[in-house]
Amino acid sequence: MICHVATLDGTYAVDVDDELVLGLVDSPVEQERVPLELPRLVAASAAGSTVVALVERRPPLLVSSDAGSTWREAGGGLPAGFAVAVHPDEPDRVLFAARNRLYLSVDGARFWRALEPELPDIEAVAWV
């Protein structure tokens, strides 16, 4: 699966499964706008009834499986984040962007693994 990562140096295509930076692409990353009224909200992403909110606190994520009616905390071991993206067809696949590294969850934001590539100053991330 491929994602686009907006950085200060441009937008990179990243193969998430093979953990490879495929190169720069000429495509802007539109940060998803999810209408949420949560304190200290940094970014949010949704697919179906799954909503993942990145907040400026520890742990950095709030996850809802019922479109925001109830929430659970997630990402206790993650660093501060800048962006998040829920895969539109597989809502258990979630990308979390820290300053220069992507983290992937394949189980609805319960467990995370750092992806190998480091990128310069990540600003946004989106599945493509």
Question: What does each of the following model-derived ranges do?
Answer:
Residues M1-V128:
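Extracellular glycan-interacting surfaces
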